[in-house]
Amino acid sequence: MKKTKFFLLGLAALAMTACNKDNEAEPVTEGNATISVVLKTSNSNRAFGVGDDESKVAKLTVMVYNGEQQEAIKSAENATKVEDIKCSAGQRTLVVMANTGAMELVGKTLAEVKALTTELTAENQEAAGLIMTAEPKTIVLKAGKNYIGYSGTGEGNHIENDPLKIKRVHARMAFTEIKVQMSAAYDNIYTFVPEKIYGLIAKKQSNLFGATLVNADANYLTGSLTTFNGAYTPANYANVPWLSRDYIAPTADAPQGFYVLENDYSANSGTIHPTILCVYGKLQKNGADLTGTDLAAAQAANWVDGQGKTYYPVLVNFNSNNYTYDNGYTPKNKIERNHKYDIKLTITGPGTNNPENPITESAHLNVQCTVAEWVLVGQNATW
């Protein structure tokens, strides 16, 4: 009998422990207030995968902080609003995130949430799960129901009528046009046969919050298997196959490129590592692959590598006389979150065998860029 009692007590203790753990999944303060939040995402644009995926909110999470302490957290799947989050009246900090995947947010302090980072992934390249954040927001909750993003009429405390804006952490860089118009010196002699589009010197890691998301992590990613050792080449550099695409002629409706993270290369001195979008392929002479003395001469001119392949790199959002920008936009020498960098490339001569070296102002390339919000940047490049 005693054994049976102890056994039953043990089961009860285990059950209580399990219940406690379930309750901790989303800590809620039983207070005198609730808050409901409606979200506004940036406009959708055609992606490399499914267009709507760029703005898809697969999971929306709202957190309420009392100082550093997480007072409440609630999530909704495939929704742009989270309602009736139980909390307490008073000054609070609101944190909103979307598409956080398996990221563990329950119980994190405000400082810990602000310090969160993300890494560039293969899944991002099909616009899947583009993480979004809004900067932490100070609000004052009143006893009863509180609302953000709802009509200002009706019951409760309407903190703001406009939906809360949330932005993608990623940016998009893409060719929307590549055309070959050889100048008189090369016309009817040289042609370019494109084979690949590469993303080069892409930041591996990004912060999720802050005026800039660029952090001190020194790791970069490339789609090319070639080691260039150029002036821009970072020391910590890894190849990933998903920053490489087989060439398909880009159009405005079917851009060709990659999603990337913030990168700042605006320093006036010292080493910079600019993010590059690059088209790669064969340089041909009189319709044939380069061989013999023609290949040797092109190599000596730093036009091609040993296989007669050439690169046409475009430094994204970069200030250069070879680049023009739409709508009077001033290039910032950086990749910024939630920006879409659309690039039109005109090739007027041979390229380079080292896309991670500075290009000369007389390079055979013209670039035209557009930026929008998504902030669109239109960039035009001529090689």
From Swiss-Prot:
Keywords: Cell adhesion, Cell outer membrane, Fimbrium, Lipoprotein, Membrane, Palmitate, Signal, Virulence
Any one biological process term the GO annotation gives: cell adhesion
Record keyword rRNA-binding present: no
One annotated GO molecular function: structural molecule activity
Lipidation positions, renumbered (S-diacylglycerol cysteine): C19
Residue ranges annotated as propeptide in the record: 19-46
InterPro entries: FimA_C, FimA_N, Fimbrillin
Predominant location: other
Residues where lipid is bound covalently (N-palmitoyl cysteine): C19
Compartments, record wording: Fimbrium; Cell outer membrane
Signal peptide: 1-18
One Gene Ontology term, aspect cellular component: pilus
Annotated site residues (Cleavage) in this chain: R46, A47
Note: The name (major fimbrium subunit) does not indicate the abundance of the protein, but is derived from the greater length of the major fimbriae. In strain ATCC 33277 and strain ATCC BAA-1703 / FDC 381, major fimbriae are 300 - 1600 nM in length and about 5 nm in diameter. In contrast, minor fimbriae are only about 80 - 120 nm long. This length difference is observed only in a small number of strains, including strain ATCC 33277 and strain ATCC BAA-1703 / FDC 381, and is due to a loss of function mutation in FimB, a protein that restricts fimbrial length in other strains.
Homology family: Belongs to the bacteroidetes fimbrillin superfamily. FimA/Mfa1 family.
Name of this chain's protein: Major fimbrium subunit FimA type Ib
Species whose genome carries this gene: Porphyromonas gingivalis
